[in-house]
């Protein structure tokens, strides 16, 4: 881990609103001091999220030596102008040695922070983060090698036609046909900007494939830009109206995602404005709360009742279930009993706009073994008619090919799709300060 850079030897006064969430730059490299702009990538010095306790001016540290982050505690008095621009390890104070994370004891700083502040500075779920578990701590797709044809199995000539079409829900009255076995996964309007959602929908349409709404409701301009639109219904049922089902080509229930399952979600009232509020069916400036599970729905029969109603309204579009990879076989059995035409399985490595790190870093089976288990279970049940979609940490064509070889019928893409429209993987989607503007609403 790098040491922070001394940005200045004096604090800066900023005006804060009570309850406002900001992210203080801890690395000293941001060009938007004292707040984060994503420049911490690769330093190991993630920004510090905090909520303003009161409205008014606050003096925030710019020397990055404070023992009371993000606020100035006078530590800059021991620095000189010659220190500006240089890395400097926080020195703590004369009474105690400051804790420093090491490979042997990587959690020591975190434990000290909890001991000093409890959850006051990080919220009741603890530290938050965005995107998925970093790829370098996951099983590697690069460790899987392809077995190619030569004699025992004859290769095809380059002029031979090869089918790439994917049929979602072949048993449905109106199966959804995609030109390629890839589509854009669920990412909500509100987590992504309107411009990003429309760009992704337009690109998917040009490629002959689809895009998912995400749990935040259907953005009309996004749906109009794509003729293969998947509608996701999650526990909060944001923006759901039966009449919309005649405009979509597939529908699925969201049980969970690889980075966050069983905990619900919260979009603060200050972010529920304008079109975001309208699409979600909420009054402006009210908290958008997603409960941990669907209220009033418990059994497969409960979900099948809604599924059959959607089929009736839509003329028979495919109905699916999005599952995080936890109780894989049992949850697949539940989905099948509820009449699933397709299953989207999100493994460990799957991303999110914001999740408690205690969830993101500690739940879900990694995508590679999760896929193998799901394929084996469906084959054992002789349910090859149910389309199996895998997602969670896949990035490149080689990853997609290997997933198909392992038994996926298709792949849903999130991070790679965002990166294709400009995401620089700053991993700060939850701050509303996305340097590429993709996960920013202002």
List each language-model region with its residue ranges.
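N-terminal pre-ligand scaffold of iron-sulfur
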Residues: 1-34, 38-60, 83-85
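Short cysteine clusters
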Residues: 25-27, 36, 61-63, 72, ...
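Short Fe-S-cluster ligation motifs
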Residues: 52-75
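Short flanking/linker segments adjacent to small metal-binding domains or redox-active Cys/His motifs
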Residues: 70-89
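Conserved, well-structured core domains of diverse proteins
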Residues: 88-182, 186-205, 209-210, 217-218, ...
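Hydrophobic residues within beta-strands of alpha/beta enzymes
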Residues: 211-212, 251, 343, 411
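Mobile "lid/hinge" segments at catalytic clefts and subdomain interfaces of large enzymes
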Residues: 247, 252-254, 259-282, 417, ...
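Glycine-rich phosphate/ribose-binding loops and adjacent secondary-structure elements
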Residues: 291-442
């Amino acid at each position: 881990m790098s040491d922070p850079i001394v940005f200045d030897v004096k604090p800066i006064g900023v005006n804060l609103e009570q309850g406002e969430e900001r992210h203080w730059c801890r690395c000293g490299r941001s060009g938007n001091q004292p707040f984060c702009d994503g420049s911490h990538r690769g330093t190991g010095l993630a920004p510090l999220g905090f909520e303003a306790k009161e409205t008014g001016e606050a003096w925030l540290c710019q020397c990055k030596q404070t023992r009371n982050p993000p606020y100035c505690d006078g530590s800059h008095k021991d620095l000189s102008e010659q220190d500006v621009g240089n890395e400097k390890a926080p020195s703590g104070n004369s009474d105690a040695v400051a804790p420093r994370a090491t490979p042997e004891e990587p959690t020591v700083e975190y434990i000290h922070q909890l001991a000093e502040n409890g959850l006051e500075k990080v919220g009741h779920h603890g530290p938050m983060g965005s995107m998925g578990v970093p790829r370098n701590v996951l099983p590697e797709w690069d460790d899987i090698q392809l077995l190619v044809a030569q004699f025992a199995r004859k290769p095809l000539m380059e002029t031979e036609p090869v089918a790439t079409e994917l049929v979602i829900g072949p048993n449905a009255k109106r199966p959804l046909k995609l030109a390629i076995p890839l589509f854009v996964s669920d990412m909500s309007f509100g987590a992504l900007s309107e411009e990003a959602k429309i760009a992704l929908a337009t690109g998917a349409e040009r490629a002959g494939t689809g895009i998912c709404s995400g749990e935040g409701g259907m953005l009309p301009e996004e749906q109009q830009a794509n003729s293969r639109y998947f509608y996701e219904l999650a526990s909060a049922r944001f923006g759901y109206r039966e009449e919309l089902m005649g405009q979509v080509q597939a529908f699925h229930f969201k049980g969970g995602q690889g980075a966050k399952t069983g905990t619900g979600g919260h979009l603060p009232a200050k972010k529920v404005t304008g079109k975001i509020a309208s699409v979600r069916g909420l009054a402006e400036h009210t908290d958008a709360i997603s409960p941990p599970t669907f209220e009033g729905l418990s059994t497969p029969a409960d979900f099948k009742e809604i599924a059959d109603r959607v089929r009736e309204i839509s003329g028979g579009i495919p109905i699916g279930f999005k599952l995080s990879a936890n109780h894989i076989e049992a949850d697949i059995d539940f989905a099948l009993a509820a009449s699933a035409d397709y299953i989207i399985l999100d493994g460990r490595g799957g991303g999110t706009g914001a999740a408690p790190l205690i969830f993101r870093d500690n739940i879900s089976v990694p995508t590679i073994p999760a896929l193998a288990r799901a394929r084996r279970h469906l084959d054992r049940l002789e349910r090859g008619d149910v389309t199996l979609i895998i997602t969670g940490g896949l990035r490149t064509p080689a990853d997609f090919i290997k997933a198909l070889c392992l038994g996926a019928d298709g792949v849903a893409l999130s991070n790679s799709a965002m990166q294709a429209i400009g995401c620089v993987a700053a991993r700060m989607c939850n701050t509303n300060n996305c340097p590429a503007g993709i996960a920013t609403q202002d």
